[in-house]
């Protein structure tokens, strides 16, 4: 018997790159930003619980913006779609006020429709998930489908979302029929099948963001933010 187990799937009709001139999208974006124009937006979509490390995301954002000139710092924003205060997590507005009262932190705590969630991914320049023991990472998978790059831990299914190269070829969903799992170090270390290379540290380019990734300022911001996250680890 050949069994295949698919734990999660993302509907490409729901999460996808959209036209930034779409009237509903523009209205949603303007309401979220309250009329402010940001040049770089970091997006966090997770529960406010200890394992998801929302406080660390706030600290990483502060560490990142501390490295920027004031005029660039004012154009950066962190959007957190989560319950701002949760007994299982922390009081995020209080943390933000204590750590970075002068920075742009936007909380999105209301329940949203699927199309509105897709708007958030399209608004963002990057989506971050640094949760510990993350099994799959639905939010970052949705982000990639929407064409927005991700910053993640090398853990669980999130590393698969960044891509692996085997014998010079990026693995596809079809390849996993014989790969099964990439998370067994002994299986892939010093084997005769070829070298398995993790490509996430080089940066994947999801569909729809090619032009953005070619912009010098965007690439600089990505590098600085990733450095800030690593600095906290």
Segments the model singles out, each with a brief description of its role:
Residues 9:
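Carbohydrate-associated surface elements
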Residues 16-35:
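A short helix/loop element that forms part of the nucleotide-sugar donor recognition site in Leloir-type
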Residues 34-52, 58-61, 78:
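Conserved donor-binding/catalytic core segment of Leloir-type glycosyltransferases
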Residues 72-92, 110:
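Glycosyltransferase donor-sugar binding loop
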Residues 89-115:
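Nucleotide-activated donor-binding/catalytic signature segment of Leloir-type glycosyltransferases, i.e.
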Residues 118-124:
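Short alpha-helical donor nucleotide-sugar binding micro-motif in glycosyltransferases
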Residues 132:
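Aromatic "clamp/platform" in nucleotide-sugar-dependent glycosyltransferases that forms part
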Residues 149-152, 169-174:
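Short hydrophobic beta-strand element within catalytic cores of glycosyltransferases
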